[in-house]
Amino acid sequence: STVIEEHYTILDKVIEMGYADKIEVRYNSNGIEIPDRLLEQWKHFQKVRFHYSVDSIGEMNDYIRYPSEWEHNLRQFELLDTRTSNNVEITIACAVNALNIHYIPDFLKWKLTHGFNKTNMWPFGAGGINYHFVYWPGHLNVKVLPNEFLDKTEKKYEEFIEWWSDNWELGVPSWHKGKVTKEQWLDASYGIKRLRGMISFARSEDWSRRLPEFREYITKLDKLRGTDFRTTFPDMAYLLDEPDEK
């Protein structure tokens, strides 16, 4: 369940006491279940901020957030984007880690071209996605990735930034059209500045000595779950090879 039963009781009590229109409620959730009951309760509050925890698209998100199913995520995206009241803000909370940093441009392009109504629209994430880093365990921290791989990732980011710069208005909702300039978009903290900042953070320390831990972790996960990292993350497949196997 998205929330425990007691949460509904608390919301009902706040509504009953007449305080709801003075209160902001925030959630960080994987959104597995979002019942109609909760949607109705949200309508009474001054503001509801729902940070939907999704880390990638398709099979990549299924792998990172095992055992999630992308088709279910899509249904929840649709529900949150179209069935929530106007006082509800929806953002994507992406945990940037060693498995998904290379594929963030794919996630962003999917989000920008999906045709969302209000999900993570300007000014949130500059109309893209909101991010935070995974710091622990160390073998999933982006600093574990070798520089030669980060070179490829940086190249991918710069190619995407060029595309996003040409299509920046995709993340600006109808109610902000004509009110946001490209200069403002370029200067946004969570836009292209954030993307380049992620690469800088990944290069800030060299933790590639922990790659053996990364390989062991992924290999054990695949054996336990019946998943296939190499197939799911093809650009990263070679990172599982021992140095003398390359």
Descriptions of predicted regions:
Residues S1-H7, I15-D36, K43-R75, V88-A98, ...:
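Core AdoMet radical
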Residues H51, K143, N147-D151, K182-A188:
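Alpha-solenoid helical-repeat scaffolds
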Residues P137-W163:
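PAPS-dependent sulfotransferase catalytic core
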Residues I10, L38, E69-L80, F107-K111:
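A general structural detector for well-ordered alpha-helical segments in enzyme core domains, enriched
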Residues I161-K246:
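Radical SAM enzyme core and accessory elements
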Residues A98-G115:
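Catalytic cores of alpha/beta
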